[in-house]
Curated annotation (Swiss-Prot):
It comes from Thermosynechococcus vestitus (strain NIES-2133 / IAM M-273 / BP-1). Its EC number is 1.97.1.12. SUPFAM superfamilies: Photosystem I subunits PsaA/PsaB. The keyword Transport applies. Residues 97-155, 218-293, 377-386, 469-532, 620-668 are lumenal, thylakoid. This is Photosystem I P700 chlorophyll a apoprotein A1. Pfam families: PsaA_PsaB.
Length: 755
């Protein structure tokens, strides 16, 4: 009798669990179901605070890394759903309440508006005349310019896109549920970094850029070419016609073969010159629109796509070829770094806080870089001459960057407290940084003191000399010059270098560094930004505030686990008010407290940056251009002589430019006047939480409870004063909200009036 061997089944790695967590609305309806203590319900009013503090702190729900990973993954889909709903709302406003088509016909004469206020009790005053007979609120998001660059020519297309956004949101909500409750990935899937890198680089960034490049070439470029030539939007063929009908493209770009297969042959045979009509290397700005050449940006996205698709094939997965991240990290040893990056692979695959800290620091820095590039090289048509939008985009990306960087430090400190394992990090870079943290922090402290006294001292000197009537003894372009020679050298270098490094480019990347004035519709789009003593001085204020922010945040991370004062700090957790009773002088030392203090300095820092930008641009860049080429700036170049004293900043910037928001009542800008007042109030309200003692409120509450008891209306849930940390959290939140909204109202009322 012969026994046949069992059929060999191909081995398949199972990377999901089926139906791991039941879908229970009954469970979700119970507040605090994720925490045993909270689930019992409220005994005191502290319960509602803890409910909010812990709802998304998945580390406290379970210690199982796989379950935590799944919750984070699922939450990402929920976040994306919210983003799609929000974007859909933006597009819907563009479709239903905007003057987009009128703006498209006359982008220099008509202002963008996508919101019309209902006149319930006289709010109709807010609907200002934005041109072309349309009355609404002027928007400063830059969406109109983005839509034009995308090739959107009518409001129906916006409507369709808005519906598409809702469909995507629904898909994301489904995915978030499906990947937690039905098919949940195993931990090894989350830790498979090579596969993740390949997919994110080649798929998300590579194919994403390729898809956008394809859209730009086949839809954006032909439509924008026709718009620039003065063809009415309603006479331009619809996007799909350019894709399906090659003869339309052949009319606009005759020297290219637009055949379905023959069109891509030059790409793979390296005959790239065939595409030079629409994949250009012009450099500089399009003189018609004041934006980057869309043919340059299409070229850029195609190049980026090629690079990232290659990058997405570099990491070792199923075929045993390519890089292994663990090997790269463990081989990375410098002459002074001991065991180098050994152990970091384990850190970054088991601590999502460590991963998030790096990502937040990188994304925050990137957002700040985006802010700088948006005005120097405006990417969309007619963006550069829309001054309110330019100011808003700069301010927005600076604030976002600041918050993300602080978030990076916050999660760095949480990683140190919750996830750091000293035994796994022996003499590697992380361990060595922690061992010489005193040297790092004391040096940083010295730098902060030096920068603070010297930068502020220059201003104090100038205020004093001006008060004494001795202008020749002031630091200024006409007195004692402190020219930013290195910055001027960099500007000059960047103006000249492309001639050698990019000989085929027609112009340098940005005229901010040097070149001719680019004017659109009689307004300055961009021109060389001349730097002088005033810029040198405020630059050192920037250096000072950045270094203080870094000092606070880095100290919080490096001393999160222990310090000479509290050697066992790691046992107290990420946030604790004091190590007491019985140990004086140990308050405000937790990782959380450093984030709290860091937020205030981040706010200081970004405020000075956006004030500098706003005034510098109004003084030296933005303005009107006469037919003979003379430029009249909004504030007539007063930055160089006024921004060199503290009094100048107070009088000629804050006070002089606040006149529009203060005098906005009775005009379409009156909402900004109300916001200006209201946000000051919110800011002042924050001080009540920041300068208060917990015991004071607890005593007050107890006497109020006594009165309620007398009247037999005592509450079942015992009222409690906010804890020290809750009070600080409420305080810093209102401080930032009030400060940012005040700045927003101040900036917009000003720039909409004069821009």
């Amino acid at each position: 009798m012969t026994i046949s061997p069992p059929e060999r089944e191909p081995k398949v790695r199972v990377v999901v669990d089926n139906d791991p967590v039941p879908t229970s609305f009954e469970k979700w309806a119970k507040p605090g179901h994720f925490d045993r203590t909270l689930a019992r319900g409220p005994q005191t009013t502290t319960w509602i605070w803890n409910l909010h503090a812990l709802a998304h702190d998945f580390d406290t729900h379970t210690s199982d890394l796989e379950d935590i990973s799944r919750k984070i993954f699922s939450a990402h889909f929920g976040h994306l759903a919210v983003v799609f709903i929000w974007l859909s709302g933006m597009y819907f406003h563009g479709a239903k309440f905007s003057n987009y088509e009128a703006w498209l016909a006359d982008p220099t004469g008509i202002k963008p508006s996508a919101q019309v206020v209902w006149p319930i009790v006289g709010q109709g005053i807010l609907n200002g005349d934005v041109g072309g007979g349309f009355h609404g609120i002027q928007i400063t998001s830059g969406l109109f310019q983005l839509w034009r660059a995308s090739g959107i020519t009518n409001e129906f297309q916006l409507y369709c896109t808005a519906i598409g956004g809702l469909v995507m949101a629904g898909l994301m909500l489904f995915a978030g549920w499906f990947h937690y409750h039905k098919r949940a990935p195993k931990l090894e899937w989350f830790q498979n970094v090579e596969s993740m890198l390949n997919h994110h680089l080649a798929g998300l960034l590579g194919l994403g850029s390729l898809a956008w490049a394809g859209h730009q070439i086949h839809v954006s470029l032909p439509i924008n070419k026709l718009l620039d030539a003065g063809v009415a939007a309603k006479d331009i063929p619809l996007p799909h016609e350019f894709i399906l009908n090659p003869s339309l493209m052949a009319e606009l770009y005759p020297k290219v073969d637009w055949g379905f297969f023959s069109g891509v042959i030059p790409f793979f045979t390296f005959n790239w010159a065939a595409y030079s009509d629409f994949l250009t290397f012009n450099g500089g700005l399009n003189p018609v629109t004041g934006g980057l050449w869309l043919s340059d940006t299409a070229h850029h996205h195609l190049a980026i796509a090629v690079l990232f698709i290659i990058a997405g094939h570099m990491y070792r997965t199923n075929w045993g070829i390519g890089h292994s991240l663990k090997e790269i990290l463990e081989a990375h040893k410098g002459p002074f770094t001991g065991a180098g990056h050994k152990g970091l692979y384990e850190v970054l695959t088991t601590s999502w806080h460590a991963q998030l800290a790096i990502n937040l620091a990188m994304m925050g820095s990137l957002s700040i870089i985006v802010a700088q590039h948006m005005y120097a090289m405006p990417p969309y048509p007619y963006l550069a001459t829309d001054y309110p939008t330019q100011l808003s985009l700069f301010t927005h990306h600076m604030w976002i960057g600041g918050f993300l960087v602080v978030g990076g430090a916050a999660h760095g400190a949480i990683f140190m407290v919750r996830d750091y394992d000293p035994a796994m990090n022996q003499n590697n870079v992380l361990d060595r940084v922690l061992r010489h943290r005193d040297a790092i922090i004391s040096h940083l402290n010295w730098v902060c003191i030096f920068l603070g006294f010297h930068s502020f001292g220059l201003y104090v000197h100038n205020d004093t000399m001006r008060a004494f009537g001795r202008p020749q003894d002031m630091f200024s372009d006409t007195g004692i010059q402190l020219q930013p020679v290195f910055a001027q050298w960099v500007q000059n270098l960047h103006t000249l270098a492309p001639g050698g490094t990019a000989p085929n480019a027609a112009a340098t990347a940005s005229v901010a560094f040097g070149g001719d004035v680019v004017a659109v519709g009689g307004k300055v789009a961009m021109m060389p930004i001349v730097l002088g003593t005033a810029d040198f001085m405020v630059h050192h204020i920037h250096a000072f505030t950045i270094h203080v922010t870094v000092l606070i945040l880095l100290k919080g991370v490096l001393f999160a686990r222990s310090s000479r004062l509290i050697p066992d700090k790691a046992n107290l957790g990420f946030r604790f008010p004091c190590d007491g009773p019985g140990r004086g002088g140990t308050c405000q030392v937790s990782g959380w407290d450093h984030v709290f203090l860091g937020l205030f300095w981040m706010y200081n820092c970004i405020s000075v940056v956006i004030f500098h930008f706003s005034w510098k641009m109004q003084s030296d860049v933005w303005g009107t251009v006469a037919p003979d080429g003379t430029v009249s700036h909004i504030t007539g170049g007063n930055f160089a002589q006024s921004a060199i004293t503290i009094n100048g900043w107070l009088r000629d910037f804050l006070w002089a430019q606040a006149s529009q928001v203060i005098g906005s009542y009775g005009s379409a800008l009156s909402a900004y006047g109300l916001l200006f007042l209201g946000a000051h109030f919110i800011w002042a309200f924050s001080l009540m939480f920041l300068f208060s003692g917990r015991g004071y409120w607890q005593e007050l509450i107890e006497s109020i409870v006594w009165a309620h008891n007398k009247l037999k209306v005592a509450p079942a849930i015992q009222p409690r004063a906010l804890s020290i940390i809750q009070g600080r959290a409420v305080g810093v939140a209102h401080y930032l909200l009030g400060g940012i909204a005040t700045t927003w109202a101040f900036f917009l009322a000003r720039i909409i009036s004069v821009g």
